[in-house]
Amino acid sequence: MASGADSKGDDLSTAILKQKNRPNRLIVDEAINEDNSVVSLSQPKMDELQLFRGDTVLLKGKKRREAVCIVLSDDTCSDEKIRMNRVVRNNLRVRLGDVISIQPCPDVKYGKRIHVLPIDDTVEGITGNLFEVYLKPYFLEAYRPIRKGDIFLVRGGMRAVEFKVVETDPSPYCIVAPDTVIHCEGEPIKREDEEESLNEVGYDDIGGCRKQLAQIKEMVELPLRHPALFKAIGVKPPRGILLYGPPGTGKTLIARAVANETGAFFFLINGPEIMSKLAGESESNLRKAFEEAEKNAPAIIFIDELDAIAPKREKTHGEVERRIVSQLLTLMDGLKQRAHVIVMAATNRPNSIDPALRRFGRFDREVDIGIPDATGRLEILQIHTKNMKLADDVDLEQVANETHGHVGADLAALCSEAALQAIRKKMDLIDLEDETIDAEVMNSLAVTMDDFRWALSQSNPSALRETVVEVPQVTWEDIGGLEDVKRELQELVQYPVEHPDKFLKFGMTPSKGVLFYGPPGCGKTLLAKAIANECQANFISIKGPELLTMWFGESEANVREIFDKARQAAPCVLFFDELDSIAKARGGNIGDGGGAADRVINQILTEMDGMSTKKNVFIIGATNRPDIIDPAILRPGRLDQLIYIPLPDEKSRVAILKANLRKSPVAKDVDLEFLAKMTNGFSGADLTEICQRACKLAIRESIESEIRRERERQTNPSAMEVEEDDPVPEIRRDHFEEAMRFARRSVSDNDIRKYEMFAQTLQQSRGFGSFRFPSGNQGGAGPSQGSGGGTGGNVYTEDNDDDLYG
């Protein structure tokens, strides 16, 4: 242990991950010799390990599995590899490329008797004596070593049968000599039972939380395997571990894997199950669980959903819960000093657990199993797809990069959804009535990248199921004009997500918020949607008035929850539409219930400041009344970029008209540029309305002409064969002319003047067009904005004072 720990003072968790340099650790390779009892090494390796041909060796694999084999030398095998066939690999629960350890095992006795049973699906339809046809030729004169629990495959009589070693005497391993008695009576073993033990979770099946897993290994495996270590140092090993994190990150899975890999007795307590209506029974259920575990030490007790049985005592009204919490506390304290029982618990609400449980000596280690990052997601996807048939075009890295905020459970769902989609495509080739499916169809099944794309469009991160997070279907093409605004937005949201290294290089944290303001109908909401879509971030849209509720304190809690969710699903864009409804200037709201609106603003302010820099959460606010918004929200560091989205100019109007009509058939002679020239002062929404009205008129005409044609057919059936062309193939000029008769401006000149005044005031209070550092060439022109006078520095301080107290 020391060799790993003292290298540059690494902490234990990484030390355990590093494999020590041991010569008896070898990499598993495919066997050339197909014998079930033979493994082969290179001659130099055998010399190093002091082994001879024909020696019996003990191999240790994953999940505490062992096997006993005969070792032979093989010149084609490289020094660090060991060749073994599939049967041995399955018994050791390892795959090609895994690492196993090998050690000499000289004292294997000859067996007196062994008991083997066949596995049911391999012996179906076999008549005759299993022993004579299979077992006798397999063991005769071979002196094979076997171990209890091994499964071996015997070929003979046209087919292969699998047997499992149920019992050996002496146990747990022996050599089958000519005078060993072989029993094979009894019911065949069911394949399902075997599969279950094969599919037990191990550490390999957990992805995306390496660091946490290393921490847990250190806390669980060390005390269970080497209690002497702690004795030598003179401390007690940790007793309890609390795993917490959002649902679906793999807390229960980790506990199962730990139990399987350590070989400890695993006792699962599901929180709600131990509750009972009879007084005293729930507590005795708990006591029984702990007694059972102590009898079978070393043991792991795993309490799932701890918050169900140990809520805060002052908050619960039921007497039963209080008694259970007290019982759990006394049991955790009363675990005998050296009884190797470790209590693990999982919850996704650590703050609702009684604080007495979270002190040292009870659940003294808390491990946060968070949402995995892109590398973690890739690990998880590789684990879930290792048994899937993937087409060559599947790029799991790409999928991992696009699934922001997904936890392990979501990724598992994603993989199965993609596989189902692959099957759906082949559904027309599959006849459900048939007993079997063609081998051709089976072989052609493969999951392609398109299936993953489809599954991605269907799946949401589970943390955000209730606040519907849609990645909107709006792209930059849908937005006409506003080029500068688009560029600024891309810099704000896409750079921190796509180029975090640049921010590190220049030592800056990216800015977090933007406020759009401008007249209604200019595309503020549309911009927010497009940015969320372009950078593949999650998008939570919050309508201002929805946050306010009638209950005291609940509105603030809503704000808190939304920010928590956004942090969980980072990178995430939080879009506050109609910000003025919830962020009015404080103090002026007379008649609002108990100052609820003020408290909501305070909560939003603190959340914006407290957003940890690690997470990419961006806030976009939109309003058309910027003058009534609380100035504290508009300071740099919160919504630091104020972007005025003006009415579109002529060029933008053409772009908007084109964007609106890009899917519609429009006649060649419709001059959109002229239309744009005539619609001065129209907002984007007004222009969209003109296009819609023109479409509507074209549709109306088309339907009317169809009805007319139908009537003509009925009156004159003989003329039916004549194929007429479409009377209204496209939207014509007269449709637009008619639509323009009803067009109106939704924003008056007066309103625009107000917005422009506001924009100008902001510019004046913030900009210094003439600021230059003093150097050889001083100056520049006079101040373009700002009231000027004196040096740039003076203006700056005065202006700042002005801004602060103004």
UniProtKB/Swiss-Prot annotation:
<dbReference type="GO" id="GO:0035800">
    <property type="term" value="F:deubiquitinase activator activity"/>
</dbReference>
<dbReference type="GO" id="GO:0019904">
    <property type="term" value="F:protein domain specific binding"/>
</dbReference>
<dbReference type="GO" id="GO:0036513">
    <property type="term" value="C:Derlin-1 retrotranslocation complex"/>
</dbReference>
<dbReference type="GO" id="GO:0035617">
    <property type="term" value="P:stress granule disassembly"/>
</dbReference>
<dbReference type="GO" id="GO:0061857">
    <property type="term" value="P:endoplasmic reticulum stress-induced pre-emptive quality control"/>
</dbReference>
<dbReference type="GO" id="GO:0010494">
    <property type="term" value="C:cytoplasmic stress granule"/>
</dbReference>
<feature type="binding site">
    <location>
        <begin position="521"/>
        <end position="526"/>
    </location>
    <ligand>
        <name>ATP 2</name>
    </ligand>
</feature>
<dbReference type="GO" id="GO:0036503">
    <property type="term" value="P:ERAD pathway"/>
</dbReference>
<dbReference type="GO" id="GO:0036297">
    <property type="term" value="P:interstrand cross-link repair"/>
</dbReference>
<dbReference type="InterPro" id="IPR050168">
    <property type="entry name" value="AAA_ATPase_domain"/>
</dbReference>
<keyword id="KW-0256">Endoplasmic reticulum</keyword>
<dbReference type="GO" id="GO:1903715">
    <property type="term" value="P:regulation of aerobic respiration"/>
</dbReference>
<dbReference type="GO" id="GO:1905634">
    <property type="term" value="P:regulation of protein localization to chromatin"/>
</dbReference>
<feature type="modified residue" description="N6,N6,N6-trimethyllysine; by VCPKMT">
    <location>
        <position position="315"/>
    </location>
</feature>
<dbReference type="InterPro" id="IPR027417">
    <property type="entry name" value="P-loop_NTPase"/>
</dbReference>
<dbReference type="GO" id="GO:0006281">
    <property type="term" value="P:DNA repair"/>
</dbReference>
<dbReference type="GO" id="GO:0016887">
    <property type="term" value="F:ATP hydrolysis activity"/>
</dbReference>
<dbReference type="GO" id="GO:0019079">
    <property type="term" value="P:viral genome replication"/>
</dbReference>
<feature type="modified residue" description="Phosphoserine">
    <location>
        <position position="702"/>
    </location>
</feature>
<feature type="region of interest" description="Interaction with UBXN6">
    <location>
        <begin position="797"/>
        <end position="806"/>
    </location>
</feature>
<dbReference type="GO" id="GO:0019985">
    <property type="term" value="P:translesion synthesis"/>
</dbReference>
<feature type="modified residue" description="Phosphoserine">
    <location>
        <position position="462"/>
    </location>
</feature>
<dbReference type="GO" id="GO:0016567">
    <property type="term" value="P:protein ubiquitination"/>
</dbReference>
<dbReference type="GO" id="GO:1903006">
    <property type="term" value="P:positive regulation of protein K63-linked deubiquitination"/>
</dbReference>
<keyword id="KW-1017">Isopeptide bond</keyword>
<feature type="cross-link" description="Glycyl lysine isopeptide (Lys-Gly) (interchain with G-Cter in SUMO2)">
    <location>
        <position position="18"/>
    </location>
</feature>
<dbReference type="GO" id="GO:0072389">
    <property type="term" value="P:flavin adenine dinucleotide catabolic process"/>
</dbReference>
<feature type="binding site">
    <location>
        <position position="348"/>
    </location>
    <ligand>
        <name>ATP 1</name>
    </ligand>
</feature>
<dbReference type="InterPro" id="IPR009010">
    <property type="entry name" value="Asp_de-COase-like_dom_sf"/>
</dbReference>
<feature type="modified residue" description="N6-acetyllysine; alternate">
    <location>
        <position position="668"/>
    </location>
</feature>
<dbReference type="GO" id="GO:0051228">
    <property type="term" value="P:mitotic spindle disassembly"/>
</dbReference>
<feature type="modified residue" description="N6-acetyllysine">
    <location>
        <position position="502"/>
    </location>
</feature>
<dbReference type="GO" id="GO:0043161">
    <property type="term" value="P:proteasome-mediated ubiquitin-dependent protein catabolic process"/>
</dbReference>
<keyword id="KW-0488">Methylation</keyword>
<comment type="similarity">
    <text>Belongs to the AAA ATPase family.</text>
</comment>
<dbReference type="GO" id="GO:0050807">
    <property type="term" value="P:regulation of synapse organization"/>
</dbReference>
<dbReference type="InterPro" id="IPR005938">
    <property type="entry name" value="AAA_ATPase_CDC48"/>
</dbReference>
<dbReference type="GO" id="GO:0000502">
    <property type="term" value="C:proteasome complex"/>
</dbReference>
<comment type="function">
    <text>Necessary for the fragmentation of Golgi stacks during mitosis and for their reassembly after mitosis. Involved in the formation of the transitional endoplasmic reticulum (tER). The transfer of membranes from the endoplasmic reticulum to the Golgi apparatus occurs via 50-70 nm transition vesicles which derive from part-rough, part-smooth transitional elements of the endoplasmic reticulum (tER). Vesicle budding from the tER is an ATP-dependent process.</text>
</comment>
<dbReference type="GO" id="GO:0042802">
    <property type="term" value="F:identical protein binding"/>
</dbReference>
<dbReference type="GO" id="GO:1904288">
    <property type="term" value="F:BAT3 complex binding"/>
</dbReference>
<feature type="binding site">
    <location>
        <position position="384"/>
    </location>
    <ligand>
        <name>ATP 1</name>
    </ligand>
</feature>
